[in-house]
Amino acid sequence: MHKLAHTSFGIVGMFVNTCMVAKYVIINWEMFSMKKVNNDTVFGILQLETLLGDINSIFSEIESEYKMSREEILILLTLWQKGSMTLKEMDRFVEVKPYKRTRTYNNLVELEWIYKERPVDDERTVIIHFNEKLQQEKVELLNFISDAIASRATAMQNSLNAIIAV
């Protein structure tokens, strides 16, 4: 009987040890999984900065080539998409700091991308129009922007996928 008790205790002991090992493995797996999730989450969130850097580099490349700021590019793109509008209406689409507003629009006029019009009945209102004479330059600018985006497409897509996975 002593031998049987010892054997039973041995089996129970092995079972207890197996349960303890299993619990240890589960706890460590949960910690590993949590750590992996945390690392993936942190990596994904950090990709916001990477993606923003890629976007900023596109605008820097455009600025260098075309001598236009981000706001000026966005104003042109908005005009091309929405058509002529007042400065006040444009403010809803493109945020330009008040201290840069006049200089931003005047630069686009100097570069001949846009022209301003004041309605006869309201001298306070200014309407901006795209200069249709620059249609070819518009196509070239859009191609330049498209190429700048395409050259970073894989990196930006990888960043975006990591962000979305968060």
UniProtKB/Swiss-Prot annotation:
One GO biological process term: response to stress
Matches recorded under Gene3D superfamilies: Winged helix-like DNA-binding domain superfamily/Winged helix DNA-binding domain (1.10.10.10)
Keywords annotated in UniProt: Activator, DNA-binding, Repressor, Transcription, Transcription regulation, Virulence
Superkingdom to which the source organism belongs: Bacteria
Family: Belongs to the rot family.
NCBIfam families (UniProt xref): Staph_reg_Sar
Annotated function: Global regulator with both positive and negative effects that mediates modulation of several genes involved in virulence. Also, modulates the expression of genes not previously implicated in pathogenesis.
Name of the featured protein: HTH-type transcriptional regulator rot
Source species: Staphylococcus aureus (strain MSSA476)
